[in-house]
Amino acid sequence: MLQSRFKMPSHDELVKRMDAIPDHVMRECPICHAKFLSMRLGRDHTCPKCGYGFRILAKRRVKITFDKFTEIDQNITVPDRYTDEKYRAKIAKAKKVTGLNESVLTGIGSLNKQQVAVGIMDPFWIMGSLGSATGEKITRLFELATRKDLPVVMFTSSGGARMQEGIHSLMQMAKVSSAVAEHSAAGLLYIVVLCDPTTGGVTASFAMDGDIILAEPHALVGFAGRRVIEQTIMQTPPKDFQSAETVMKHGFIDQIVKRSDMKKTLTQLLRLHTKENAYG
């Protein structure tokens, strides 16, 4: 009788039970492959085992990083001249998912009463790709920061230039870098935080222009994708050759900072590099 009451379910029954579990209940870390309940991600949305920062919406990053934030240029979006139906459908979906009109959220934030110009790229907005409107928003942010003598903190998370916009997308690399150079010439601080993923034209331009370059643990940082590199050099690169940790070993990143420590670290850096502390 006991055997019948505690009989192991069949394979088919187990599959049915697993299928009944909602997808969002369990998560698997793409880095260490640990499996855990979604609630263990916590407020910062990080792996409880290895500290990998899962990709998050730009608006969520604002909430966990800044004391106050006022958005600017929120109505700038993809120009109407791009009429491809598939592209317009992707734009509509991205707007619905993120609540943003473009792949970057810009504004003025504060950390411990220190004002800072903020740019946050959203990986859920067509992979945070760099389009003409993205470049315009970031350029305006740097121009505003230069006029107001503000430091800039930029969180990059992007698949690179947005190919649907062709040369107009690629032009944004030079356009933004020019605005960064003017900001730097004014003696103002620019901090970059490389998030997963930071690749392509963003890596080749303003993501590596910072005075201080931070990164989140295990973030993918590179230019070309692994398959492109393998086909070009006819070799298999190391598994972690584009991880933030490897990139830091080669001198391109100053420090890797856990997401839970990011607010504190940025606050300290801004305080140390204000003109009063640096020159007063």
Curated annotation (Swiss-Prot):
The molecular function GO annotations come to: acetyl-CoA carboxylase activity; ATP binding; carboxyl- or carbamoyltransferase activity; zinc ion binding
Q: Which domain of life is it from?
A: Bacteria
Q: In which pathway does it act?
A: Lipid metabolism; malonyl-CoA biosynthesis; malonyl-CoA from acetyl-CoA: step 1/1
Q: Which GO terms describe its biological process?
A: fatty acid biosynthetic process; malonyl-CoA biosynthetic process
Quote the record's cofactor note. Binds 1 zinc ion per subunit.
* Location(s), subcellular: Cytoplasm
Domain called CoA carboxyltransferase N-terminal: residue spans: 25-280
A GO CC annotation recorded here is:
acetyl-CoA carboxylase complex
Cofactor(s) needed by this chain: Zn(2+)
Q: Which reaction does it catalyse?
A: N(6)-carboxybiotinyl-L-lysyl-[protein] + acetyl-CoA = N(6)-biotinyl-L-lysyl-[protein] + malonyl-CoA
Q: Give the enzyme class.
A: transferase
Zinc finger (C4-type) stretch: 29-50
Keywords for this protein: ATP-binding, Cytoplasm, Fatty acid biosynthesis, Fatty acid metabolism, Lipid biosynthesis, Lipid metabolism, Metal-binding, Nucleotide-binding, Transferase, Zinc, Zinc-finger
* Pfam families in alphabetical order: Carboxyl_trans (PF01039)
* Record-listed E.C. numbers: 2.1.3.15
Q: Which family does it belong to?
A: Belongs to the AccD/PCCB family.
Record's subunit section: Acetyl-CoA carboxylase is a heterohexamer composed of biotin carboxyl carrier protein (AccB), biotin carboxylase (AccC) and two subunits each of ACCase subunit alpha (AccA) and ACCase subunit beta (AccD).
Q: What is this protein called?
A: Acetyl-coenzyme A carboxylase carboxyl transferase subunit beta
Q: Which organism is it from?
A: Lactobacillus helveticus (strain DPC 4571)
